Every structure is written in structure tokens, then in C-alpha cells.
């Protein structure tokens, strides 16, 4: 049964998440605050996914709360049809949206696809993702994505075992990025994000990362392969040459989609106010505010002065 509370957009409060790296200043500044880099460099927006941080006992980490303090996860469980639509009732939102702002380069890592995740982690989702650059600390930042040339598994395994950080990074395509740029990251593609870019990341709703480079980072080697060992983990890595994809391709619709259409989509959506001030469905809204829009929402009044990033899960069917 669809309830009145699940037919209107709801504001979500910030959900800052602990990570092994520092950052987050640009998230604060986006919201008109002075800004500081800390061990909470990410804000998980409209999230029903629990964050995985080895050694930390935080069962609710990563879970978004609505403006009344309730967990979005619980609200969806109480009215799955209203929030997710009839086709997805009782299921998942299918997407995790983050704002992340590293103050340091992240290690080279990759994520499993759905098939690998199902076999090894019992998950219906892997971790294909996409980055939308919202702002940068300087004129531009940089990311590294995919192998420049094919590499055989023995060579790559040697780089990991030796923690040859120079080879791990040099093997990747370096891509300068500026505000407004988009990079699509298929599961299995090795990558790293550089310092100084505020990114809106859309991804499948998991926290699976296989980390090739832990030397110099507060990461234990035994946590790098998610407990399955490197022999198994390397089979999830795409060792082919990769041409960076600087847009959201049609293939992304299987996982998520993003646009700037400030209107209901007939399925669960996360809205991030990228710029402006005004109102969303009568509620005050300004740059940095975030909302979740239920599938049952039919019409939402949005001030013309607001620029909104609409983030969607996989297309139905």
C-alpha cells in the first residue's frame, strides 16, 4: 500500500562516511560551510547500503536518514511499492550515490562485476560506477582509468606482490578532469582518483573494492582482496587495454543513469542540488541539499533557479 509519505520528495541529511583516506573539504564548501579535510571524505546520498570499513564496528555506517531522523532503509521496507515502484517492490533501490572529495590520491583498485560478486560474495550487485565532476580545488584534477596496454596476469600479480606502486599507476591511462566531466568505470577496470576533485559517484549498491596498492596507505594486506586471496581476486580484473569512456554510455542504463531533469522518473531517484537556491516541493533548497524522490511521486514543483542532478537506478525490465 502506497502511503502519503512515499509520494512526496524527502530531504536526506548528510551521511558522512569514514574512509581510509582524508578529504571532504569541497563537500562542506558546496554547502556554504568553511570546509575541512577529515577521515570522513564521503557523503552517501539516499543510501540503503552499509559501508564496509575493516576493524570498525559501525552497523549503520553509510545508511541515509530522512529529515525526521528515520532511516531511509526502514521507510522503504515499510512501503516498497511507493518508494521503488510495483516492479521493484520488496527489492533494492539498485543504486548508491556518493559525494566524495579526496585530498590525496587514492590507491589503484578495481571492483567485481555482478557474476563475480554473486559467486564470491553472494551479492546480486557488483560495482560498476561513474564519476561526475562537480568541482575541483584547482583548475583541474586527474584520474587514472584502465590499462594503457594489455598486461599479463603474472606481470600484474608481480606488481601487487612487490607493491610496485610506480608500475601500477604508470600502467593506467591518466585523464585530466574539470568541472562537468564524466568518466564511466566498468566493473573490473583498474583505476584511481586523484586529489582535489569533488565527484558525484553513481554505482551499484555495494562496497566491494579490491585494492592493488596498499603500501603507503592505512590498509592491511589481508584486507586488500576481500578475504578471497589474490589468485581468485585477479580473475575479476580486466587486463585488456582500455580506452577511457568520457560519458555515460547506453550500457550504463543497466546499472544507473544521471541527468539534469528535475522531474519524477516513475522510479526511485536521488536529487542533488548542484547550484542555486529556491524550493523543492515547497521545501527550501540550496546548493548541496539532497532529496530522495519516490517512484510514486507524480508531480514535483521545483524552482527554476535550481540546477539538479537526478540520479536513477537501473532501468526497469
Indicate where each model-derived feature is located:
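Short acidic-glycine-tyrosine-enriched beta hairpin
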Residues: 172-184, 279-299
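Short beta-strand/loop turn elements enriched in aromatics
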Residues: 135-159, 248-250, 262-267
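His/acidic/aromatic-lined binding-pocket segments of jelly-roll/cupin-type domains
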Residues: 97, 106, 123, 129-132, ...
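An exposed, glycine/acidic-rich loop-and-rim segment of catalytic or binding clefts
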Residues: 151, 169-173, 182-184, 190-244
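Transition-metal
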Residues: 1-151, 215-243
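Ligand-binding loop in jelly-roll beta-barrel domains
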Residues: 101-105, 113, 136-139, 189-208, ...
Amino acid at each position: 500500500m502506497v502511503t502519503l509519505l512515499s509520494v512526496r520528495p524527502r530531504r536526506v541529511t548528510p551521511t558522512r562516511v569514514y574512509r581510509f583516506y582524508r578529504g571532504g573539504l569541497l563537500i562542506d564548501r558546496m554547502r556554504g560551510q568553511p570546509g575541512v579535510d577529515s577521515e570522513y571524505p564521503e557523503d552517501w546520498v539516499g543510501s540503503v547500503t552499509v559501508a564496509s570499513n575493516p576493524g570498525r564496528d559501525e552497523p549503520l555506517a553509510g545508511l541515509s536518514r530522512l529529515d525526521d531522523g528515520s532511516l531511509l532503509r526502514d521507510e522503504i521496507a515499510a512501503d516498497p511499492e511507493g518508494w521503488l515502484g510495483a516492479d521493484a517492490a520488496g527489492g533494492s533501490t539498485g543504486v548508491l550515490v556518493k559525494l566524495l572529495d579526496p585530498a590525496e590520491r587514492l590507491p589503484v583498485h578495481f571492483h567485481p562485476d555482478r557474476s563475480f560478486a554473486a559467486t564470491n560474495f553472494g551479492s546480486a550487485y557488483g560495482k560498476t560506477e561513474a564519476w561526475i565532476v562537480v568541482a575541483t580545488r584547482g583548475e583541474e584534477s586527474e584520474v587514472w582509468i584502465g590499462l594503457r596496454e594489455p598486461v599479463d596476469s603474472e606481470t600484474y600479480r608481480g606488481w601487487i606482490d612487490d607493491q610496485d606502486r610506480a608500475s601500477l599507476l604508470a600502467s593506467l591511462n591518466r585523464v585530466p578532469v574539470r568541472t562537468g566531466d564524466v568518466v564511466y568505470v566498468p566493473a573490473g577496470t583498474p583505476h584511481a582518483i586523484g586529489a582535489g576533485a569533488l565527484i558525484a559517484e553513481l554505482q551499484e549498491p555495494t562496497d566491494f573494492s579490491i585494492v592493488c596498492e596498499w603500501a603507503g596507505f592505512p590498509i592491511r594486506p589481508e584486507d586488500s582482496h576481500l578475504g578471497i586471496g589474490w589468485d581468485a581476486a585477479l580473475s575479476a580484473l580486466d587486463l585488456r587495454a582500455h580506452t577511457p569512456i568520457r560519458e555515460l554510455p547506453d550500457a550504463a542504463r543497466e546499472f544507473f543513469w544521471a541527468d539534469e531533469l528535475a522531474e519524477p522518473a516513475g522510479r526511485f531517484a536521488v536529487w542533488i542540488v548542484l547550484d542555486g537556491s529556491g524550493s523543492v516541493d515547497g521545501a527550501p533548497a540550496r546548493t548541496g541539499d539532497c532529496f530522495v524522490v519516490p517512484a510514486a511521486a507524480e508531480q514535483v514543483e521545483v524552482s527554476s533557479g535550481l540546477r539538479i542532478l537526478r540520479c536513477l537506478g537501473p532501468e526497469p525490465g
